């Protein structure tokens, strides 16, 4: 089948290892097959091409974590990318993100940037008819991560407030949209004036990084890392929560522990989300009329262009692949 896959590892020039062509990857025969209609790119794909989380001994590896498509029974489905346990098994109601043996698609098992993807049947979530395949394909990684950060780890209260650091990328943009949909007062930072305008259009109040906010917030969504972490601590109210799911600009952050203990702040890690949380996210999108922010929809034949766009960093929202063209 035709797929976009990592054929080599290159930390300095990740796109040098991207190959588009025919491949016949091995997956467990008992898993469900999904004919992919749309997929979406994530920075995880670039990190894989750099060799982070993907060793040379696992090459070639089909890339991609996000997909929506049709299973062998004709059902329209969204693929949950977290594969739990040593054999991909996951029990109902179990938080598979806490499984020490968990992997994401494209780390141990072939990913979604292909004509077909196989996953445990547990990983299939019904796609609501209100969402297009392109919209649904945006949700399983970045949007699910943002949902868990806000609702589960951050425990965002009704009528609460949230700061999103470094808005513009997939997770941060999702956090802005979801925070607004949840009824929160949303503040977001970006160095780019154009992105600040687009953040404001989504319903948030935009600031330059490091700016003083009108209030201290219940929840801070932190993915930038070292350059913004002190600001995140200063912006959290007493008993507030700083939820971290990335450190794109540096992972060695200085922390004023006096602020942490005196204000009884919580610093919480968050990674992806469960199948049940993905189902809840889909329901929220339908009930609140929420739709993912899509930067560009490329045809699958343009996958190299899509990756180049992702690497450039000049993206606001998700990059989507339409597998019909």
Where are these regions (language model features)?
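Short acidic low-complexity segments
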Residues: 26, 71-72, 206-214, 302
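Glycine-rich cofactor phosphate-binding loops and adjacent beta1-alpha1 units
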Residues: 185-187, 193, 197-266
